[in-house]
Amino acid sequence: MQKTTYYDNSSTLFGGYSSYQVQGAAAAAANGFGGYDAPVPVSHHQPAFQSATHLDVDSYQRSACSLQSLGSTNSHQQQQQLAKTKELNGSCMRSSLPPEHHPSSQVSPPLPPNPTNGNSGAQQPGGSAGTSSKSGSNKSSTSSSSISSSTSSSSSSLPPNPTLAKQIFPWMKECRQTTKQKTCSPSNNSGNGAESGSSGEKSPTGGSSASSKRARTAYTSAQLVELEKEFHFNRYLCRPRRVEMANLLNLSERQIKIWFQNRRMKYKKDQKSKGLSSSSGGPSPTGSPPLTMQSSASYLNSMHPMGGGGGYDVPSPPSFGKPHQGVSYAMSTAYSNVPVKGCPPQQKYGPPDPDYGDPHPHHSLVQANSAGYGTPTNMQGSPVYVGGGSYLEPMPGSGPSMYGLNHLGPTPTHHQTMDYNGAGPMSATNQHHVGGGGPPGPCDPPTHPTYTELSAHHTSSQGRIQEAPKLTHL
């Protein structure tokens, strides 16, 4: 590649509506690629000026858009015909340049390569038209090659002339933008022009993909009311209903799906905070024990698995108004093989009683008639199995509670009642055991197991579930 001299003729640059002229030798034209010189713009309204250039034959043979191989004359003739039919606009310029930058059909002819004619002054428009009619093929070949070489120079950004790097023409900027659009059109906002703009406006969810942060969707109050109503009836939305709501509320399916996801998370959070507050504030009014109690009961259940699958129903809460003097529990005579300390191994127990889980008061939570439910101390323990029946829930005001499983012998009695010995309000220091404490041994079948007061050494249990030995021995 050899350097060429370049003379800028600045008086002919008019606002970008210009065609570019490249002088090339006859050999370079036969080669299919004209010699590259700096383009000199020629306006529509002015006589065509030509830059006085002298150029060697074989300079800058490179094309970005043309698909011809070097030195093929057949493809060069095809390119001539293509350039003629497209009125010298250039097949590659049409795809890359906007229409206002396309060169017009009035192209000044190339000069013969001798330097004397190359140094001639201004050429008249009439003369330019005459010579353009004479040298049609030469002109078309050089114009198309000038277009291709100009695009190649801008895209490859390797100009042969150092002065060309300093001057940036509007077509260079435009072509750089178009190559940028081609390579990264999905991520470029200004890339596809109206297409990406309209798609950004059409899609209400995220705007165009060039914006890294999605715009926050603002729901109207009417939309929120409808969404909340739907969430109240159904927390999980099926697809047909989602499509219906999207059409109804003028939202996209994706927005409705994401709204429901967020609403479910909020609902879970609310439930969790409600559960924590109710567990700290006494028995929960909904009938299911608080979350901490449930987890403790399941922990106890895993330590001492009951027969019949280990699952249990949550008993209905006792009516707070009437205290039961003798709350009878359904103590089934059949237990699972819970290892009990000091008991003979012939105590084999079967599945629990069939009427377990009945929300009758004798299955309900244990109530002390004297310990009022308004006592300020919180319920610190957790519900436990008593026998094969339902929960034993700790008394409010009983402090850290201890539980023991009722040890029934292999007696065929179907139900046994537990009476409360009518002690006063249970103090926080005294512990109360379910089961046959007192004079009979732990394995003797107590016919009427009474609540017996224990010594104060059991008060160290911090409201948590007791270890297995403390649970079973009395």
UniProtKB/Swiss-Prot annotation:
Keyword DNA-binding annotated: yes
Intrachain disulfide bonds: none
Domain of life of the native organism: Eukaryota
This protein's UniProt keywords: Developmental protein, DNA-binding, Homeobox, Nucleus, Transcription, Transcription regulation
Biased composition (Low complexity): 130-157, 185-204, 274-292
Listed GO MF terms: DNA-binding transcription factor activity, RNA polymerase II-specific; RNA polymerase II cis-regulatory region sequence-specific DNA binding
A Pfam family annotated for this UniProt entry: DUF4074
Chief site of localization: nucleus
Stretches with biased composition (Pro residues): 439-448
UniProt keyword Transcription, yes or no: yes
GO cellular component: nucleus
Locus of motif Antp-type hexapeptide: 168-173
Alphabetized SUPFAM superfamilies for the sequence: Homeodomain-like (SSF46689)
Family under the similarity heading: Belongs to the Antp homeobox family.
Functional summary from the UniProt entry: Sequence-specific transcription factor which is part of a developmental regulatory system that provides cells with specific positional identities on the anterior-posterior axis.
Protein name, entry field: Homeobox protein Hox-B3a
Taxonomic lineage from the root: Eukaryota, Metazoa, Chordata, Craniata, Vertebrata
